[in-house]
């Protein structure tokens, strides 16, 4: 059975993206950069799962209809779905409340995000996101 993981790239009014740092005790890729998201549960769509996970991991409430699908990638037995949502607020207007899964967060410009050092052992999902954004920035 294929597992579906749904994540959201959150962009604020200033064009900065919300990046999370996984906690040191996270079972997968501890300490690595991440986006809010997680597994799609049986009764959910990938959009509703992304909205739920954003709220659980950051405290930010978004509506699933505001999510725009950017890509779907298959890696081994997992289907990765990435959405984007624009929030008409600045980072100082957005209260981020992290769950146990993450230890800190940072708002980054696209160039900061693309210049981030990606370890060889990075989550394939995160590598897909960076590759996708690089492709867009070159277009």
For the regions a protein language model found, what residue spans apply to each?
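Conserved Nudix-box catalytic region and its N-terminal flanking loop in Nudix hydrolases
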Residues: 16-56
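A short coil-to-beta-strand element that immediately follows conserved catalytic motifs
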Residues: 61-70
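A structure-centric signal for secondary-structure junctions around beta-strands
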Residues: 5, 14, 29-30, 79, ...
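Active-site-adjacent beta-strand/loop module that shapes the phosphate/pyrophosphate-binding cleft
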Residues: 3, 12, 71-94, 106, ...
């Amino acid at each position: 059975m294929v597992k579906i993981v749904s994540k959201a790239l959150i962009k604020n009014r200033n064009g900065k993206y919300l990046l999370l740092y996984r906690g040191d005790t996270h079972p997968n890729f501890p300490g690595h950069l991440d986006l809010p998201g997680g597994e799609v549960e049986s009764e959910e769509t990938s959009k509703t799962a992304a909205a739920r996970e954003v709220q659980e991991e950051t405290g930010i409430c978004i509506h699933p209809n505001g999510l725009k699908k950017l890509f779907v990638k298959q890696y081994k037995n997992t289907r990765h779905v990435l959405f984007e949502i624009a929030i008409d607020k600045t980072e100082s207007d957005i209260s981020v409340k992290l769950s146990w899964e993450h230890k800190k967060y940072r708002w980054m410009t696209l160039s900061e995000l693309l210049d981030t050092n990606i370890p060889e052992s990075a989550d394939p999902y995160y590598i897909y996101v960076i590759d996708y954004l690089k492709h867009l920035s070159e277009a």
